[in-house]
Amino acid sequence: QASIFSRFFRMFSFIFPFVNVIKLIIASVTSLVCLAFSCVALGGSAVALIVSTPLFIMFSPILVPATIATTLLASGLMAGTTLGLTGIGLIMGLVRTAGGVSLLQSPLRKIIVNRIKARLGGGGGGSRLARLKKILGLLNKLRGMGAGGAAAPAAEPAPAAEAAPAAEAAPAAAPAAAPAAAP
């Protein structure tokens, strides 16, 4: 029996090439817009920084506005750089997709999936009871650790000869420590 998803994908499989074309158009337009904004932001920030530097030196008593302006210029430079890197990344993704390497077939994806599976302990295999036992074992291991991460020292039993005098002295000291009631 075919699942509902496989029937759906077989029924609408003619749409997938159109979706790829739409993704290509959106990614190319987005990359061009990001690159254009990055050029404007980087150019404007660089010109403003070049113009404002001598003004900051000449009018040094105005430190608060100078700090604000410098912060804005630095954030403009960062925004331009980020937009530029985003645009370049989109273009590289388009080139990779045009070369026939999709994300599903990418060797980088396989590496990432294998790392995730290794960290999760096999990728979800096994029964719930086995996973519960593994978690409880880890908790017991953590509970047995001392403050410095070392195993907790085992408590040594007190010798019977030393424990007997202490047990006899304790009841005699208890009545003497009780406060007397005032009349």
Curated annotation (Swiss-Prot):
The keyword Transit peptide does not apply. GO terms for cellular component: membrane; monolayer-surrounded lipid storage body. PROSITE patterns: OLEOSINS. The chain crosses the membrane at residues 24-44, 46-66, 72-92. The full-length protein is found in the tapetal lipid bodies of immature anthers, the proteolytically cleaved C-terminal product is found on the coats of pollen grains. Not present in seeds. Signal peptide: none annotated. Keywords: Lipid droplet, Membrane, Transmembrane, Transmembrane helix. One of its GO terms (biological process) is reproductive structure development. InterPro entries: Oleosin. This is Oleosin-B2. The gene is OlnB2.
